[in-house]
Amino acid sequence: MSIIDVRDVSLSYFTPKQETEALSGVNMEIEAGEFISIVGPSGCGKSTLLFLISGMLKPTSGRVLIDGRETDGVSTKVGYMLQRDHLFEWRDVLSNLLVGAEIRRMDRGQAARRARELLDRYGLSGFAGHNPDQLSGGMRQRVALIRTLVTDPDILLLDEPFSALDYQSRLTLAEDVYKIIKDQGKTAVLVTHDISEAISMADRVLVMSKRPSSIIAAYKIRFEEGEGLSPWKKREASQYNDYFNSIWKDLDGHAVVS
């Protein structure tokens, strides 16, 4: 059974004067432990689809199931990592890591132990008492990911989490995030405008059309060099350019002209 099952989902926004259809007939199944990337033209509804999976939005029609159950509000099985880290500047790193646990009323001592274990495992144990303004952009995003992991969700939704970083930091952080998610055995859905990023991190890449959006193509990412390649090694792999060119052609016909 799929851990995420999106069945014929459509979403419309209504105003007194008109109806705007954002998503139309979206279907998607994701297995536990998969890393999925979603690409599409600007404004096509990629982030909206994440909101639907998280339970923060309800579809106009269709169904979204998490672990076989239809979503009804925000699911504790789902964690979110946004474009901005949203760390509280007046709280140190450890206190920031406990925000999600506090909201969900988890045992504070148990949450703090898990937070320290994660900081230690991923090389940030020396920064537990630092304030966010003492961290680099990449370190802040690592802290944001660890904050999401403290509540131990099964699914991680990543909404362009590297977009605010310079190119070198993006590559480094993408490598780290990929390793952490695979190490933790999580299911991940990444929304990105970057085709290279999508291919290098994902087991599958889904391509969305312009509005009203649907999924128009899906690519199972496999390389002759074998399984278990890091994102950086995937960029150097023999079939990488073939995937890139195919996805680019899919997107080229759905570009939004302003």
What are these regions (language model features)?
Residues V39-P41:
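The feature captures the beta-strand-to-loop junction immediately N-terminal to the Walker
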Residues S54:
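Helix-to-loop junction immediately C-terminal to a conserved catalytic motif
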Residues G62-V74, R114:
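Conserved ABC transporter NBD signature motif
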Residues R91-L98:
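Short coil-to-helix segment of the ABC ATPase nucleotide-binding domain corresponding to the Q-loop/switch region
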Residues L98, G109-F127, K179:
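Conserved ABC ATPase "signature" region
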Residues H130-D133, T151:
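Conserved signature/switch motifs of ABC ATPase nucleotide-binding domains
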Residues L145:
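Hydrophobic anchor residue at the start of the ABC signature
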Residues L156-D159:
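Catalytic Walker B motif of ABC-type/P-loop ATPase nucleotide-binding domains
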